[in-house]
Amino acid sequence: MSKHRLFHIAFGLIIVLGMNGCLKEGSETIVYLGYENYIPPIEDVIPQELLKVYSDSIGEIPRGYIPPNVEGSFVINPKHRMLSNNLISWPLEVIEPDLTFSISNQHNGVIVNLNFSEATTTPSDSVYIMGHDEYFTIYYREIKEFVDEGFTTVVTRGMILTGEIHQEGIRNLRYADIIIDVYDDSNGLIVQYPAGQYFIYKDGDELSNRL
């Protein structure tokens, strides 16, 4: 066999082996290794102000490249207010309505489907997850639309959800958001929280049960 042909065979084997080494198989999908590098760090999605408040008041958020599987449906009941930088307009003693949410199609640091019972809320970009063992952090940006008296207000928020996943549900759930941008076509007639306002919630009994 000629050296020229041996070279082409060897080159072909290198290409095939290289391609196999670049693939990682999940439960239902195959993605390229290094895909995690395309997942933005939480600091690029969530404003530093909320991250600092979260760290100071709750503790460091769970991090890691191998988060637990958190697929399922859950209910925050009772939904308690924990902390805000606007306690005059947002008193902590108010108990809010229960909040249900569902998570599905989780793959390699991305959650394809995240749905809340608040129908006006829609993620505006990908939903990301990181963590280790049973500890996880979900983070993303969302757009929430309010319609009142014929006027529309559109709020862009940064969202964080952390907790510990267990068979019975999510323990020690914390759920926070910060307003990043506000569009208001009422010329100030409809007053909403301004950009920079943040709000942190928890499940009052420290367990968000599976549904």
Protein language model annotation of sequence segments:
Residues 1-10:
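Bacterial N-terminal signal peptides that target proteins for export
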Residues 23-90, 202-211:
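Amphipathic/hydrophobic helical signal segments and adjacent flexible N-terminal regions
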Residues 76, 80-124:
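N-terminal glycine/threonine-rich, aromatic-flanked beta-hairpin/loop signature
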Residues 153-211:
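Glycine-rich, aromatic-bearing surface loops/beta-hairpins
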